[in-house]
Amino acid sequence: MVEDHKSRRKFLILGGATGAAALAGCVGGSDDSNSDEAGAGLEGNGNGGNGNGGNGNGGNGDGNGNGGSGDSMLRDDSEFDPNDPGWEENNYRLSAIVENDYIRGRTEDLEAMGEQDVDEVAHGNPLPEPPEDESELVDPEPLVFVDQPGEEGEAQYQDNVQPLLDRLEEATGKTVQWEPVSSYAATVEALRSGRAHIGNVSTGTTAFAVNLADVIPFAAGVQADGQFGYRLLAITRTDMDEIQSVADFPDYNVTHTEPASNSGHQAPSALFDQYFDVTPDEDFEVEFSGGHDQSAIGIAVGDYDCGPICSTCIEDLVNSRDDIDFEDYKVVWGSNPFPPGPIVHRYDLEPGLVEDIKSVWLDTDWAGTGYEESTGYADFVEIEYKRHWNDILVIQRYNEVEYESGNL
């Protein structure tokens, strides 16, 4: 159950426009059809307990449960409605989530995030202002871009990122170097130290980068079909019939990914409390796996029973391996979409250089390039930190996150 101090903080999520929109209707889809607000991650799935009773009480009409066994809430993939999954009554295999394009959000969601009525940053420092003393402005040579290679590995990623590096050199007239790192914490440190000038950070670590490294987030990626971002999914194995809701998690071995991860820890810590009255570290012991891949694999092989995960991360992992399938996982809840990790630049770069850097992402069609192949993004759109990241910052405020390097 929720401690009093958590209960007092609930209004921080529900009191804002996004939280109110989330409660307005049980939409479950990639946008909130009952509101102009996006409500990223603050899904209005109704009532905390959400249908965790009736484990194995007969069949559900699709062959998944009969004779007193099976998950009576598990539906056939064909029954999934991305506009209204009805999580309080339904579970689905991960294959249904993927096949119905529920992994990401839509352009309308991203636009609504940017239209939120937000006066100031919800948690932490506002964006840093450029130095008033022009002598403190930086015009680096070479220009260093820091990023974390994806599943394809460092060598393949370097080939795929080369079109970006070439475009940066063309736009800025500078030599551009790519610095690969093994974690987002290393990305933040490279930017903080001034060793790197541009970078790609994750959604959850964006506020750490702003507060610790004095960066400005300016662009987020969108796929060619207009989809963007990712969702928080609460997953288990398909054969775990007894787990039908996040409300069932306290009885099982739950894994989170990393402390600073938005979908892997920060968001579920707030939203599981909000919608299921389940408080991580109070109702169950949080065991960190070390990352989304580790959580997904650990659940598949039985090291863990269930946990939160980033939708695009598990999609990429399953697509990259032959030993696990989408049908191996069951989804018992999904959030509204979160924005993807942004592109950032240090605050103290020469203004003209900043404009050249922005143009590379915002004015280039990346369709058909290796960069699109690696990132999944054909286009990048301009973002405003205090608005597009408002819901993430509200979640981090709820969790009383302190922006210190030791918390990354």
Give the residues covered by each predicted segment.
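Extracytoplasmic "Venus flytrap"/periplasmic binding protein-like
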Residues: 213-221
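Domain-level signature for soluble enzymes in the chorismate/prephenate branch of the shikimate pathway
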Residues: 219, 241, 259, 287-301, ...
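Terminal disorder- and signal-encoded targeting elements
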Residues: 1-183, 193-197, 203, 207-208, ...
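A conserved helix-loop-strand patch within extracytoplasmic ligand-binding domains
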Residues: 220-275
